[in-house]
Amino acid sequence: MTYRLHRKTVFPGLIILLLCLTLNAQTGKQEVPLRPVSTDRPFRLKVKEEVGQRCDLQMTRVRGNSKIEKPPLIDVNVLYYAEAVFGNPAKTYGLLVDIEGERKLIWVDADGDRDFAEETSYELFKSDRYPGLNVYYSPMPLRFDVTYLIAGEEYTMPVYFDLPYLIVARAGYHDFLLLKTRTWLAGNLYLEDEEIPIALVDMDFNGCFDDPQDLFLMDMDYDLNFSSSEAVKIRNAAKLRFKRRTYGEIDFGSVPKKIIVTH
């Protein structure tokens, strides 16, 4: 049996097919891998010095303490103890501080398992920026292995935090230390044969990079630097104009591993 197609049937079908092919060519979904960078932030942020994750310090016994499964390998009974909260879902990480010894030290429970025996210690130094106060700081950033739940699977990434000051022995005040996220995320978006560097910055110091107040940056002038004018808060970054007449949607559901861009 022979079928005959009329022009009225063929031409509209061809037009629809061409339109579909054109739209598919113009629309693409791209997975952008992210990598942690632990140098200074991508641009100088105007963040107040006292802003960060504030962790209260309390003197505590290190033996027989449910929060300390194994204490550091030093001969002391009492140390300062603090807790920081990072990751998604939030997880508690302990810190122990000794400012009574010849060397002032802080131990970080990097993986949150309450075992300080094998953990790295960082030396603290007294700051002269606050006369009359016992203020210490760490010149080395503190490392935490922060965990995230992505699509039902656990993902762990090292995140570094600066310790700009630790204040103790203030009459009538709580002792505390302050942590500021040093690590940021970098990646490269490919759009119309061009490579656009991108970055994500943790602005609330919880080791996450996809909170509404965190920042998403694109180096749109290709000067290999990020500026504050190239930053937008995550809550405003679901839909962006990448280039003139080119718009896209960004899915931050897999941060810090990757973002998914549809354009």
Where are these regions (language model features)?
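Calcium-binding acidic motifs and repeat modules
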Residues: 26-263
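Short, low-complexity, intrinsically disordered N-terminal modules
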Residues: 3, 21-24
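Bacterial N-terminal signal peptides that target proteins for export
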Residues: 2-13
